[in-house]
């Protein structure tokens, strides 16, 4: 099964599954919120069903939430949202937006499951205004004895993890792609450290 079919298949249950990590998402909201300003235009890549888009979009001028799964976007559009929020199906590695279009790019819980995250990061860099922010909460490889087993079980359903970064290796990976790390924080979740 390819990745898009996997996410389309799980889109109806994704929000319920992510509720198990509600505390983690609240921590992500709390970390991102102070950087958001009313005059900002934000692009979100891999928005899923709107776990970040819906609660954070009221704090900015516009929030363009995208995902490559049409079914995820369909589910996201069912969420309560504001006129500032727009959902669309987009490929994070081939964005239709012009250079320097956004004040911030959010790519949450997705870099590790992208076959070529460097392409998405390059596109994010291209569409970011000078001095813009990238918010990239990402599951990292932990030391827990159950981490490998969980991934194996998830893999049986078609879920692919292409990159198993530690927190340090993820920061190095981002730095190698021009991003300056202003803040990092390790959060816990039901699945893996973030």
What are these regions, as identified by a protein language model?
Residues 104-116:
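A short SAM/SAH-binding and catalytic strip from SAM-dependent methyltransferases
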Residues 147-166:
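Conserved Class I S-adenosyl-L-methionine
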Residues 162-177:
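Short alpha-helix
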Residues 118-130:
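A short glycine-rich, Lys/Arg-flanked "PGG" loop and its adjoining helix->strand segment in the class I
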Residues 136-138:
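Acidic carboxylate diad motif detector
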Residues 1-37, 51, 75, 142, ...:
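Conserved class I S-adenosyl-L-methionine
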